[in-house]
Amino acid sequence: MANPVVAIVGRPNVGKSTIFNRIVGERISIVEDVPGVTRDRIYSRAEWLNHSFYLIDTGGIDIGDEPLLVQIRQQAEIAIDEADVIIFMTNGRDGVTAADEEVAKLLRRSNKPVVLAVNKIDNPEMRDLIYDFYALGFGEPYPISGAHGTGLGDLLDAVVRHFPKGGGQEYEEDVIKFCLIGRPNVGKSSLVNAILGEERVIVSDIAGTTRDAVDTSFVREGQEYVIIDTAGMRKRGKIYESTEKYSVLRALRAIERSDVVLVVLNAEEGIIEQDKKIAGYAHEAGRGVILIVNKWDAIEKDDKTMVEFERKIRDHFPFLDYAPILFVSAKTKQRLHKLLPLVRLVSDNHAMRVQTNVLNEVIMDAVAMNPTPTHNGRRLKVYYMTQVAVKPPTFVAFVNDPELMHFSYERFLENRIRDAFGFEGTPIKIIARPRK
């Protein structure tokens, strides 16, 4: 289930960034007293009453046709489009302004749940200022103070009441869920269309957790697959494509709902820092990962090109050394027949369990081959290991002292496990615990 998205929206200078920082608990947004200073949408994960959600801080919506104001308004509209719930921020000291009324019109058109917050109510005597805000038509206004942090509990209680119940679309355990992530113009949509284009069975679009996230379900060789958030990839337009924060948020939510993540790279443009960042999200989430190099038809090649490109990938993504690499072309369908079998293999590995007795034979052989490290005259002792979880495969090593488990030795044990059992395409976690 993907976390809901909450957007804080309002005209400039009502204190959106201060409230964002209060809820998230970190000072992420730049807070200045100049209208229009939060130019890009900033988002972070937040929690309230066991509800985890993404919070987006938007630039102030100002009615005007200066290029920057137009851009801020477009960014805020994207945030509204993405949100499950909107916090409409106003400033109690200013009363209801014409700009507030314009924002209210925009929010009414969105048909999203709106919780009205009246900021800068810094003491009880100021509470009477909230009554004018009923006129905006969003029900009860919640008095809050960004300066003192008061009133936020009631506000967040109201917000979480609007969260989707039951977490949206759930799929059967044996359905393989995967998503395609990558920066703009790497060919994600073309790849999806190429995968589905060969399909001879009925392709159905299934509504996901957000209003416009559509998942696409299909069957190939008896296996049901779901491509998560095909709607997000099909969204077009300069603003969507150029807004990195928009695409990152969308990618994070797709990753959360997937078993396997296809990180798509562009063969023509090579690898850039943004690719690394995007791939990092999939790795940190513990999902199965496949690196897809698209547009392979578009570059000149000799017999060394693929090997050199693969070496570059391994240099740029050392944390994904377990991920297989597939060179494809959505345009010419080159190697596309290998893609779904690889997704299936990685999904199986991601959910694989190994027998404890076989695992411990491997671990004891590894320890005999490469003795455990010592620290301050004390040697690490590994008594036994057991697998405690899948998706990703997670192992607990029972040892004399977890502090003695150096990351390099942990890495050595991981490599021995991979040599013995495969686990291609999936991260592995090893946790050292003291034997009771």
Swiss-Prot record:
Q: Does the keyword Kinase apply?
A: no
Residues annotated as domain KH-like:
352-436
In this chain the EngA-type G domain maps to 4-167, 176-351
Which CDD domains does the UniProt record give? EngA1 (cd01894), EngA2 (cd01895)
Q: Which UniProt keywords apply?
A: GTP-binding, Nucleotide-binding, Repeat, Ribosome biogenesis
Q: Which positions bind GTP 1?
A: 10-17, 57-61, 119-122
GO molecular-function term, one example from the UniProt record = GTP binding
An example Gene Ontology biological process:
ribosome biogenesis
Q: Which positions in this protein are listed as binding GTP 2? A: 182-189, 229-233, 294-297
Which Pfam families does the record associate with it?
KH_dom-like (PF14714), MMR_HSR1 (PF01926)
Describe the subunit structure.
Associates with the 50S ribosomal subunit.
Q: What does this protein do?
A: GTPase that plays an essential role in the late steps of ribosome biogenesis.
Stored PANTHER family: GTPASE DER
What family is this? Belongs to the TRAFAC class TrmE-Era-EngA-EngB-Septin-like GTPase superfamily. EngA (Der) GTPase family.
Descriptive protein name: GTPase Der
Q: What organism is recorded for this protein?
A: Geobacillus kaustophilus (strain HTA426)
Name of the coding gene? der
